[in-house]
């Protein structure tokens, strides 16, 4: 198939970081400045659209030709930019595109062109140009009007012709680097199903989800009034110009509690409240707590990223978590929305929409908490539709039991599904009927289930058991009981550890159950999942760890520092990746199946799909059945879904 590689440089006064690509490309002054392209291995060409050049007919025809594959690094942006700036009746259908960034992510590489080039040790002429950031800042964003620049708000090519020529070289170089990455990774096949899943992901992101602008604006207004009132009260009590300033407030508090106050975090304030004798000091600390709780960032993110038709697009990044291939949240970060527990959610929502802020304060414990619980409800279906929400029930627990052949767990999932109760019964040798919701044993079963599936020990339980419901001295016994009750799972951890080490040491392939394989390929360890998809670990080695035993190392992105570095892994961690990746593949199957049945997915969160469906179409039972359909590559995996319908998004 003929390939057309593309990179565009654009201008818009909208900030892409806060608004996202879809809203950015809708900006009234959005335009493509430069269009670099190359067919197959031909030299890269540049079209200077900003200076009146036009795209050759061959390129225009190719953009609309389904037999020519278009590629780009982060193709979602190029698709959006071209659709917005040029007229194509069918837009830029994702099935005619491939994304080299996604290819890099599937190989365990970073998600930026610059870092991929470095990770692959490309020569300088195949690396992204270092001057790029400054050039983008100069030509692609509004500039500050100054006396020196004649009070202009935008830099055009004629304002610095030398920089402009360099910018053209930079744009061409991006195509060179993208092509070099694509060629280097082309020997590693992507399955057809993964290609189709990316295409569906693009359709879902293009589709977007509706938002309630009245609710969003009222939430922002309510927060502003509430925060201003708290700040005024704090000013009166302290006499400080800015009681929000930690430096000023620490000094003021220190003078009144008799010692230096070094921290004002949510963990340190309760201690200060306990020792405070003065009522004013107590109230100031309470105000500080309340001000810290007010977070309307997600409402603001919705407002900024909302497109002209009221929909937010681009909420999900395909393969954003590249150890597992799961999606990552973008813009509103739907993967970590606060839960709603208000019994009268509808009333609270209506009070906010109609601006009855005083009533909200009178009826509910806390305005920040109420606003937080209403965030989900700002997502709304189309006129005449309702949301259908369905998610896999305990999917990771089911997948790990299936892989490990832990029969008692499979029996639980094939029948009543009460895994917390069954786990406690198995661990403490009591009848399951004796364990009721809310009982101590059920709580222990639940915490053990959530903390111990991937090799977790005492530390994992302590971080999971926030309320300290289990005495510390009981924790080692709990770990032992769980592992004794799940011998096949603990065996599976170390079987995977041995398989990975054998594959690396002997440069071979180790086959396990259900088509799970550990495959050594020069420079890469692949874990092939039953679905056929492969997880990649770059430059794997067996090295001596800090405790003197052999450990598996590989190169990857360190999650907190975002640096490309050497990472360690071991059996239980590999099992976590395998299980979560398999659960993700199950979600992919459900996405294909619900779409085929006419249910339109607008976004998804972990193992849950949110579908925007006409009120006279479809049944929840059908959706649950679709989720529970046996998967050909996972024989015997017991899948089950729970679902509900709603007029706005919420947690049931």
Each model region followed by its residue ranges:
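Conserved "right-hand" nucleotidyltransferase catalytic core of DNA-directed polymerases
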Residues: 1-10, 14-16, 34-36, 119-121, ...
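Active-site palm subdomain of RNA-directed nucleic acid polymerases
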Residues: 185-197, 586-608
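Short active-site loop/helix that positions an aromatic residue
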Residues: 76-89, 107, 250-256, 393-407
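A short acidic-Thr-Gly-centered motif at the start of a beta-strand
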Residues: 1-2, 60-64, 371-386, 592-596
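Generic long, charged, amphipathic alpha-helical segments
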Residues: 419-439, 547-602
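A common structural junction motif
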Residues: 625-635
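Active-site-proximal helix-loop-helix substrate-binding element of RNase H-like nuclease domains
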Residues: 27-33, 37, 41-186, 343-345, ...
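Conserved catalytic palm subdomain of right-hand nucleotidyl-transferase polymerases, strongest
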Residues: 5-6, 73, 97-99, 379-395
